[in-house]
């Protein structure tokens, strides 16, 4: 039986120190091939722009989407896109657990004094993915400057809080969906429906979704707290489910609860892992 909470002789601070060194080594290795690294970084920026192109085409045909103007939807796009991109850099490697379980190589993660999740993240860390942050970051800056927001202190604070909480939500979703691999092995497509699919959902107001899907992204997989509720709070827009705009203030608590749930599920999954040789 594996111990997923093993933290080595120096505790969690020691683990984070080891993680930073492993990530640093990975970055230095990638930087040895600078031309390739830069090209891959630029390609990530261009790929991120495809979703924005779809939104631009949509607003070439309509003036507003469920009462949201182009700049207001751009605000959704920026908040969700930045959060997703940062989570992609640090947490998307969790989905590789299924590949290692299937190949019988997950056992090696259990023999080292570092949590398997951090080993997965550090081992496949790719800084080039940070290129996906650039484009939604620019869109977010333009949207914040161009929309009519009453910049009270609480609204100013909401922007970094929403970005941090949204990153945690996406990271937790990656870990949760990847945990299923310990029972079914093949989970990447299942996980993509909630991670990459969830990123697409955060780009639009939930007003355009059907009632059951609105409830799903609000109460089950709380993607509405990534961009929709924070943006509605900034813009003082009403919610189709009748929730007050202050629902956005629950964003940090929701992200923390989801992160704790993800940790519990992952730990339980690793604890009951049986290697191919057992």
Predicted features by range, described:
Residues 2-278:
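Hydrophobic transmembrane alpha-helices and immediately adjacent juxtamembrane helices
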């Amino acid at each position: 039986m594996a111990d997923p909470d093993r933290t080595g002789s120096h505790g969690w601070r020691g683990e984070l120190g080891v993680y930073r060194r492993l990530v640093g080594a990975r970055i230095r290795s990638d930087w040895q091939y600078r031309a390739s690294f830069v090209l891959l970084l630029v390609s990530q920026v261009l790929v991120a722009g495809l979703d924005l192109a779809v939104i631009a085409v949509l607003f070439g045909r309509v003036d507003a989407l469920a009462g949201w103007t182009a700049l207001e939807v751009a605000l959704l796009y920026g908040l969700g896109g930045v959060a997703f991109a940062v989570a992609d850099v640090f947490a998307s490697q969790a989905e590789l657990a299924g590949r290692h379980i299937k190949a019988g190589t997950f056992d090696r993660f259990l023999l080292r004094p570092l949590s398997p999740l951090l080993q997965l993240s550090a081992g496949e860390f790719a800084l080039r993915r940070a290129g996906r942050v650039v484009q939604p970051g620019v869109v977010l800056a333009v949207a914040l400057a161009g929309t009519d927001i009453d910049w009270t202190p609480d609204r100013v604070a909401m922007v970094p809080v929403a970005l941090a909480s949204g990153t945690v939500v996406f990271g937790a979703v990656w870990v949760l969906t990847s945990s299923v691999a310990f029972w079914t092995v093949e989970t990447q497509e299942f996980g993509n429906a909630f991670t990459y699919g969830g990123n697409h959902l955060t780009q639009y107001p939930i007003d355009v979704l059907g009632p059951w899907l609105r409830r799903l992204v609000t109460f089950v997989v709380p993607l509405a707290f990534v961009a929709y509720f924070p943006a509605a709070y900034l813009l003082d827009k009403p919610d189709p489910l009748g929730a007050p705009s202050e629902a956005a203030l629950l964003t940090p608590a929701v992200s923390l609860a989801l992160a704790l749930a993800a940790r519990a599920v992952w730990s339980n999954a690793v604890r009951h892992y049986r290697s191919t040789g057992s």
